[in-house]
Amino acid sequence: MLSDSGAGGSLDETFTRYFQDIGKGRGSSGGHYRRNSKRELERFVEWAAGERGPDEWTGIVPDDADRDPKFDDLSESVFREYARHLTSDRGLKQNTVQTYYAYLSAWCGWCVTEGYLDTHFAQRASATAPLPDDDGRRPGDQQAWTSDQRHTLTQYVDDAAYEASERLSEVPADDPDAKARARYKALRAARDRALVYLVAYTAIRIGELVRDGSDPRRRGVRWEDVSLSDGSIDVYRKKQSWDSASLPDPVIEPLRLYKRRLDPPSDQWAVFPTLHFATVSKQVKEELANRGLDEEEISTLREDSDYDIFLALSKNIRVPSITTDGARGTLKRITEDSDVDVEHSKHEYLAPHGGRRGMGEVLVRAFGYTVAARYLDNSEEMVRKRYSHIEAGELGDAAAEAIEDIDG
């Protein structure tokens, strides 16, 4: 667990761990990516310290403070200003600006996962607003998980969940510490598996599944919203109303086994509770204090349970859902660990919206735009626009057949 002083640490203190982590699962391209990422992060730190940029730029540290930039200094406005700096001050081509900002955004996401930041500032709409648009991007250019990618990713989480469960069963009962560690890993693996299957097969937007910190109405789905017997889940839609979405057969078994592993004390628990140590710890301590326990009693309970999430489960202390940033971080980790092939100009991992678009392509090709629109919770007009490359390809094939029939 990270110390509470993490947010007050300097930015470059994290670089060594970050570069070690991103080197996992990247194969021969890892060194090139790390070198470029290191260069751009060092430039960002120099800019944040006021050592880069126009003459009037003094950095993000308060004028009365003589120190290096820290995580406490970061905000949406800081990343927006840096995006503006990349766009305006360095004469870079727009695709280069997008690439350089992506290095920074990837590090910011890692910092959220590791607990240095609570919010993925770099992905906020206001932060990315100054970035140039991707000129010439066609609807078919946007990421959509392919059949091979879905299979590779789901096979990986299947194997990981099975192996974690097997390891848990092999740990002797007289080794409680090892048992707790194995139980935690089995829980996380089961949660990862359920999340991947939902993203891969339901076409539900990630903001409808998990918590969005900027919108209190999007608190993440709870078990009371899920009916495994009916194959449905109630979600708060983009159109700002509750609606039922379908749970296809491939999703049911991962969800059922995950629920059995989690064993929530009530159906009001989030389906995907955060496992972020600091967040769970804070929730547990505050709730136990509200129930009248003193610090010594709380400390004893926490020491006896090894992991705060297990204490929360045993005492029915509901912890919040994982956030949209956390879900993206989870998919990044799984993508890297699974060695799935990802070739995309904007994303180096299988992003949640790519899972949704991948299912959209399957449905449009199999059943047409009307059925796909209902499943995607979109208008048929919008679906036709976003998946116009499919119709264009089919029309091209039809034209080729017609030419062959007529011209012989």
Tell me what each language-model feature is.
Residues 16-32, 38-141, 182-184:
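N-terminal core-binding DNA-recognition domain of tyrosine recombinases/integrases
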Residues 61-65, 117-175, 390:
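Flexible interdomain linker/hinge and immediately adjacent N-terminus
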Residues 115, 189, 198-216, 365-367, ...:
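A short, glycine-centered helix-capping/turn motif at helix boundaries
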Residues 129, 401-408:
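C-terminal secondary-structure termini that scaffold catalytic or DNA-interacting sites
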Residues 152-206, 210, 266:
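Basic, Lys/Arg- and aromatic-enriched nucleic-acid-binding interface segment
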Residues 211-306:
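Conserved tyrosine-mediated DNA breakage-rejoining catalytic core shared by Y-recombinases
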Residues 294-374, 381:
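Short, basic (Lys/Arg/His-rich) helix/loop patches that form interaction surfaces
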Residues 376-401:
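Catalytic-site neighborhood detector that most strongly recognizes the C-terminal catalytic loop/helix
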